């Protein structure tokens, strides 16, 4: 398997030459595709499997994700609050000049 992965990595570099050779053999073609997927996504699934094996670690990750989401929500709430303050200042300026006219239709 390691040999296949190594061979799959090499064709990625020598795409024109080796790619044509592999393309000729239907059996090698799917193998190459699988090898490529494993090589490309190898780091991702490997880590995923590790997390899956460690249930406690996976749970901690989930908790961290939830906390991150909560923090993100709070930040989002703060941002609109800050955005409103400048708008209020603009409205105050508008109230002094044209604010009364704008408020009447409102």
UniProtKB/Swiss-Prot annotation:
This protein's major location comes to: nucleus
Q: Name one GO cellular component term.
A: nucleus
Q: What is this protein called?
A: Immortalization up-regulated protein
Q: Where is the composition biased (Basic residues)?
A: 82-99
Q: Whose protein is this, by species?
A: Homo sapiens
Q: Record keywords: Nucleus included? A: yes
- Mind listing the UniProt keywords for this protein, alphabetically? Acetylation, Nucleus, Phosphoprotein
Q: Where in the cell is it found?
A: Nucleus
Per its UniProt entry, which superkingdom is the organism in?
A: Eukaryota
Q: Which gene encodes it?
A: IMUP
Residues bearing Phosphoserine? 29
Q: Where is this region: Disordered?
A: 1-106
- Pfam families tied to this protein: IMUP
In this chain, composition skew of type Basic and acidic residues spans 64-79
N-acetylmethionine: residues bearing it: 1
């Amino acid at each position: 398997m390691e040999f296949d992965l190594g061979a799959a990595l090499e064709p990625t570099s020598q795409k024109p030459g080796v790619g044509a050779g592999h393309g000729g053999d239907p059996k090698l073609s799917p193998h190459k595709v699988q090898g490529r997927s494993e090589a490309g996504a190898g780091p991702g699934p490997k880590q995923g499997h590790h997390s899956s094996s460690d249930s406690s670690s996976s749970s901690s990750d989930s908790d961290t994700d939830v906390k991150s989401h909560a923090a993100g929500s709070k930040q989002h709430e703060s941002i609109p609050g800050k955005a409103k303050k400048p708008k209020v200042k603009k409205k105050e300026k508008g109230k002094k000049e044209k604010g009364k006219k704008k408020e009447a239709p409102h």
